[in-house]
């Protein structure tokens, strides 16, 4: 659409009082609203931790690693951005302190600074600014930057200073600061307190930033009196104080922010040309969210279920599969260890209409994943395996159908006599500890060719697909013939046929048994469910209906007997 003056406008989203307020969802929702107004929008996450990327971080601490098309290992908020914008982002959408310092130190070693004393200001802040302004490539109308952490944290200061300098350099009329803050409700007194927000804004002012608008996160809607008080004490206009209470679905947040007038206020302050919001696609989504025609239970069998964010994209992809089928998906978290025995698997999975086994690393919980897959196969419960989930499916079939009793992965047992899952040739040094672990896996989008009459080809509607990957191990080609003879169909491979990408069981044998080496959840969108997840939920709906009919028939038989 274009803007006046500077080619791109910049919106900086900061957070105050506590972490995990929903800055990422707020930023994503604003981005979706601006895009629905006809503006070209892109987004960036600025993380203050010293890790270069989250690729080697513990999932229990950080949550999932979101892999972009170009192979960058990024923060899970990038997943929110892609899902809400319905666009792919690149690795430059995630900047960490580790990346910034690594780049600055490398420049110092090369002599790029010509003998200068390298300091946080200006060298670190200049590097951050370069990465902020690099988002203008492609000439977006708006760049939304989310600054991680909480205002007042030492780690965030260089990013806040860089944002302040960007405003100074490109003009105040081209920059908008949006602060997300907590307004707690004190139950004994029945009051909502504004003091934490006042202190948070005061801390922001100390670094030279006055917010243009404040999004107030709370348990319940904020009344006009509280809004007026925040506007007065924090020196923002009345319409700039936005109430954003907890919502039953994250996909309702854009509606909440629009009703509060945030998107209209932003485009007004930034002098953006825009149209009214086109709700066609989003309203259809919300109709599916609010009015499901059926309900299914999907068991997600994982190692990191104590932190659901470790599987954020998987759960959102399952829900999107539900939206596509007008079904409500209830995700039941199952610790993989609990499925290691047949009895344990039966107890945990007997009520599941479908089973999803996602990715992971390390030996813990693997036998439980194999046990869950065995249960899915034997009881004909719809199954989808992702990355390690596919590898475990291959191990299960090798052991129980192909008679390879010692089948295992070289990741878990380097001495196994039957490594049906083996280390990729280019990953041997990294696995042996002779190369860096960070950023060295098979990462990013890779093509695959699908067998013409396969279930996966039918689901995708094509025989050529591209999916994102993150792995070091692969199906051992030495066992492919034995696996296929046992009934496991290799339905998709790399274009040269050398790497197994998809496996499945014949539909005459099992209603839906599909697994992939890829991470298809990373390409799913709430408005465009991924074919594999759409297919899984469709099969789950069929399974639930069959189970319901079976239960009804059994009940009527008992009545007749009486």
From Swiss-Prot:
Q: Name one GO molecular function term.
A: glutaminase activity
- Which SUPFAM superfamilies does the entry link to? Class I glutamine amidotransferase-like, P-loop containing nucleoside triphosphate hydrolases
**Region (Amidoligase domain) residue spans:** 1-272
Q: In which pathway does it act?
A: Pyrimidine metabolism; CTP biosynthesis via de novo pathway; CTP from UDP: step 2/2
What's one Pfam family here? CTP_synth_N
Residues recorded as binding UTP, renumbered to this chain, are: 19, 193-198, 229
**PANTHER family membership:** CTP SYNTHASE, CTP SYNTHASE-RELATED
Protein name, UniProt field: CTP synthase
Q: Which organism is it from?
A: Cutibacterium acnes (strain DSM 16379 / KPA171202)
Encoding gene per record: pyrG
